[in-house]
């Protein structure tokens, strides 16, 4: 099967928003974690397209190839950018999937335009307490800022930093590509985290009224938060893959794609 893929931009309140479309089936929007880009889903594009989806992956403003915001965005700001893209592409009956920060974004978006949403997948929703948010934010803010060094040691430092927050990592390619995305944001990765930690995700989750699945994996660094979200909404389908890290799409591509397709196509 010949799968078509193309990249494009639209204008947003934060500048140009970059996205990639693969396939020609039912629309499925993918929103990435922080700090990352649409590249975190790249291994899933073709198998999802082969399963009948038009995969629309988006670089959140400030990440990947989207322009950086000149002010601190909120999750609603990010969601409005995707809403504008849905309108630009004239999409209906759209499925949404977001990972970590992306889960916050698509959850918010599902409340904005529920009439356009078919199904929702929250991959590792960060339902955290205020104390947990404060602790994580403190760690992120205290992390050394990357400064280019003549001997290239800043690249080693960045590699060690990602190793520290990816315990149990196994996929070298995912680690390498993750470092590339961290280099892209050039120390400005904090926007996505601040937006996610400022959102009242519990309130948002409580208001969702469309078919939803919470997808997680037992090796995810916020696996506990996904379990907490499931306890809040026991009516949502809950599915956990075994092991892995926040690079689960790379580590277990086939199982991840199968889980996504089974939920979205079982209607």
Question: For each predicted feature, which ranges?
Answer:
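Flexible "cap/lid" loop of the alpha/beta hydrolase fold
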Residues: 107, 111-112, 118-149
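N-terminal cap/lid segment of alpha/beta-hydrolase-fold proteins
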Residues: 1-16
């Amino acid at each position: 099967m010949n799968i078509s893929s193309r990249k494009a931009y639209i204008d947003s309140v934060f500048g140009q928003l970059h996205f990639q479309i693969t396939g020609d089936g039912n629309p499925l929007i993918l929103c990435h974690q922080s700090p990352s880009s649409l590249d975190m889903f790249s291994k899933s594009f073709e198998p999802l397209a082969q399963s009948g989806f038009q995969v629309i992956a988006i670089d959140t403003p400030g990440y990947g190839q989207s322009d950086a915001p000149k002010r601190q965005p909120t999750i609603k700001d990010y969601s409005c950018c995707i809403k504008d893209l849905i309108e630009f592409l004239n999409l209906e009956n759209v499925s949404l999937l977001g990972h970590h920060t992306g889960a916050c974004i698509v959850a918010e978006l599902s409340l904005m335009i529920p009439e356009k949403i078919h199904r929702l997948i929250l991959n590792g929703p960060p339902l955290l307490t205020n104390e947990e948010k404060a602790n994580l934010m403190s760690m992120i803010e205290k992390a050394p800022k990357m400064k280019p060094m003549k001997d290239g040691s800043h690249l080693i430092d960045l590699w060690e930093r990602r190793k520290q927050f990816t315990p149990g990592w196994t996929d070298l390619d995912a680690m390498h590509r993750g470092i590339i995305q961290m280099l892209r944001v050039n120390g400005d990765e904090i926007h996505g985290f601040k937006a996610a930690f400022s959102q009242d995700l519990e309130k948002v989750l409580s208001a969702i009224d469309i078919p939803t699945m919470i997808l997680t994996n037992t090796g995810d660094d916020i696996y506990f938060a996904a379990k907490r979200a499931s306890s809040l909404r026991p009516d949502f389908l809950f599915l956990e893959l075994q092991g892995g890290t926040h690079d689960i799409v790379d580590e277990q591509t086939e199982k991840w794609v199968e889980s996504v397709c089974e939920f979205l196509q079982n209607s």
